[in-house]
Amino acid sequence: MADLPHPLAAFIVTEIRRARGASGMTQDAFGRGAGFSASHVSAVESETRALTLDFIKGADRAFKNGGLFERMVGKLGAPSWFLPWLDAERTATQLRCFQPSLVPGLLQTESYGRAVIRCNDTLSDDEVERRLAHRMDRQETLTKATAPHFVAVIAEAVLRRARADFRDIMAGQIKQLTTLAERPNINIHLLPDEVSMHVGLTGPFSLARLPDHKWVAEMENQLGGVVIDRDDDVDTLMSRWEMVRSEALPRQQSLDLMKEVVTSWT
């Protein structure tokens, strides 16, 4: 977390460090209880080593607190399974994202993101705003000094499908996409409507290339999601990425189409 600590991860690290100090545990004693070396604990606490879900679970074991820190991650807007992906996203040198049904979270406007999150009508207003704030914080990934090269493939239908009362939100969202698409580190490609059959129909996925050149992936479903690091599975998703990317429009044609589509919402 040396270059730009993720707000959520940095907060959790601070709370773990504070709890350790309040309990009187040394880093060595805490590490024995958590299953990590004292040097590992020191590196996480000084934010020179990434916070992981395993470390959070280890902290809960060391403090015997019934899973407090893992629950805290969820309460602050990110499910615990998502934390490894947040770290991958933050440290990645390259990001790839395919979305057949929504604008990717890293590209969403606040209004669009709020509307999407509100589709889950079981969430309270406070929970909606917590999740939205977390999503907006993540977008710093694409604008920081060491921003990764980000390539998104979005189905054209995503930009054309909305309720009548969604017009202003959608217009604002597409305008933001056209602005972001002008950034040198961001490529946005539209998968045109006429490509009706493709390998991406089975669902969205993302890929991240880490500083050690290893690729990891993330997939979501109705019950949550999973971060994938098994080489064979990542290779399969990389192959599918290449297939959907090859079906999408080139960068400039995609930008021109976005500018055309936005006029239908204004």
For each predicted feature, which ranges?
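Bulky hydrophobic/aromatic packing residues
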Residues: 1, 60, 69, 85-88, ...
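Hydrophobic protein-protein interaction segments
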Residues: 94, 100-266
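Short, charged recognition helix plus adjacent turn
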Residues: 2, 70-102
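Acidic-residue sensor for enzyme active/binding pockets
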Residues: 45, 89, 220
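Short secondary-structure transition/capping segments
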Residues: 41, 80-82, 201-202
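Basic, Lys/Arg-rich alpha-helical nucleic-acid-recognition elements, primarily the DNA-binding modules
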Residues: 1-76
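Short, leucine/isoleucine-rich alpha-helical interaction segments at C-terminal helix-coil junctions
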Residues: 19, 72, 76-79, 244, ...
